[in-house]
Amino acid sequence: MEGVEPLGEDLNLLRAFYELGVRSVGLTHARRNAAGSGGIFKPSGSPRDGLTNFGRDLVRECERLGILIDLAHINPRGFEDIVELTSKPLIVSHTNARKFYDIERNASDEQIKMIGKRGGVVGVNAILVSPDPQTSTIDRYVDHIEHVISLTGTDGVGIGFDFCEYLFLQLPESVRAELAAKLTTPHFIPDLTNHSHARNLTRKLIDRGFSDEEIEKNLRDNWLRIFKETL
């Protein structure tokens, strides 16, 4: 579940979704809701408030039930609140390193370290790798992977492609312009836009000197580990 709007402010609905099979919850998207506020697609300016009382209760109930908490879209203060309120591994399912693209939607070095210390996984996103279309490449994508590894070790990184160019291209030009003004202009990696392109990433990881074991961890094993440990 990405954004807990379907719950309103009713924890009983969280339990109902759990019974229906939901095992991972991200509290917000890039907006405010009853649980907290999302991080914006700019270097600063996200709401400074943390989780609401409902959001804090929700986090505690997720941990009690065994629902994996995803911090991909939460604002910086909400991120800190979730870390403080929990003890189990956490994930950021699809993000990038602010070192290469400095927006609050991406993860700071300190946030990446928090996830690593908890035994969680940071999934690297195939969209927000660079503010410049010329450097939105698979090489820059691998730069993000290497940076996360430098902060968490090889067990702390995964793939979080978030492929959505096909959706973006279906939108009218006016809607694309509105999204660009409100969020940011996405720069898609030309040879990494759908799942059939995953082999291009594997080839690049080999070219960049990753071992077979490291590649397997990046592409599969780290996610499998966290799912087995927490779900």
Question: What residues fall within each predicted segment?
Answer:
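A general structural-boundary detector
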Residues: 49, 102, 185-188, 202, ...
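Short aromatic-enriched loop/helix-cap "lid" or pocket-rim segments at secondary-structure transitions
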Residues: 39, 170-172, 230
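Active-site micro-motifs of SAM-dependent methyltransferase domains
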Residues: 97, 165, 225
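Charge-dense, low-complexity intrinsically disordered segments
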Residues: 45, 49, 135, 188, ...
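Soluble non-cytosolic domains of exported or imported proteins
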Residues: 53, 73, 106, 135-139, ...
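Mid-to-C-terminal alpha-helical segments outside catalytic/metal-binding sites
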Residues: 190-231
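Short acidic/histidine-rich active-site segments
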Residues: 126, 152-176, 183-185, 190-191
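Extended, charged catalytic domains and RNA/DNA-binding interfaces, predominantly
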Residues: 1-131, 144-150, 156, 177-180, ...
